């Protein structure tokens, strides 16, 4: 590929407004960084096709630095993939999308400030993003205050669509209780009845811990103990060394760099040899596998997305998505990792928004209520927009339910053990919207 072609690709991938700072370039190759800088001055080649059509402004807040940076960067790739594909195919309602990116630095206070800037200064029409659950929780009231639609794209904390729900926020993928009810029967029925949980000690880890305690008990098992480990802990040994006793399996709830840390250190301490080893699939995301090596062998996890072309995922639409994602991920990681669930859910979140905007004839902020009504009950059919599978965005709480994949790592690769249909993951709504 020529330098000119590379620049064009990155021009399309990074068409957003803002200054190019050193922080924005962290994690990109020098060639890609150069191309990124160029796009601040040169519009994407397809932009001219829209003439004078006013672009929709979509804000996306992601952790591009700090504890969540590794996942935040792949999440951003998913957003960009969808936006570029939409713009190349004629936009939404004949208008292009302009993407405005904010780095929340993996900090709730920074995230809230950045979201307020997106809404007040950048004047975005809608927002798609949110990675760390504590940041999602901090920002949700802001979207409600300014009456702007917020499509959550990674955060899994249970309360986002239950006790802390609001009319302006939607989650078009799974959440902690759905994963737990899908996985607990396998854990108890095929691996062991007594479990010990180690978890990331913040909103997501805590709500996921609670969900598994409940569902393992319902399945006939027992959680005999749990230990929280602060987010970003580089040396987990002082915590892991406290884990001992008579139980069958160790269950981990971690992601990103912390997933690599516990995978390696639990192995080194002999915990994954002494006990069955299972957990949230984020521990063994495709982007983590190289750093885990053979220490993750035999791990059993659950995830909404696994990058394999087998069974129900052996479809033309999934192959197209996976191949496209590998090309885009290679631009930030030369090893060309397979896509993770963050790429998938962000890609599909943008596409869900597109459907809602088309259905409502959305023009801008003045049509926010029309957009909300279009998104409530939105049916998303498996295909190029939604390669993960069918889903419906429930009207009562803005929560979707999707099929889940139980998998293990065999010879360094993903192997699907069970596919749990979305119908088996459904919980009754537990949300009361405040009148707007």
Question: In which residue ranges do the predicted regions lie?
Answer:
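N-terminal secretory signal peptides
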Residues: 1-24, 33-39
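C-terminal segment of N-terminal export signals and the immediately downstream linker at the start
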Residues: 40-67
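Beta-alpha junction/loop-to-helix N-cap segments that form part of ligand/metal-binding clefts
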Residues: 53, 70-77, 90-162, 172, ...
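Venus flytrap/periplasmic-binding-protein-like
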Residues: 104, 151, 158, 231, ...
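Extracellular/periplasmic Venus flytrap/periplasmic-binding protein
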Residues: 113, 158-159, 166-269, 312-320
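Periplasmic-binding protein-like
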Residues: 118, 122-131, 151-153, 196-199, ...
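Extracellular/periplasmic periplasmic-binding protein-like sensory domains
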Residues: 266-347, 360-362, 420-435
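Segments of small-molecule ligand-sensing domains
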Residues: 328-343, 354-416, 436
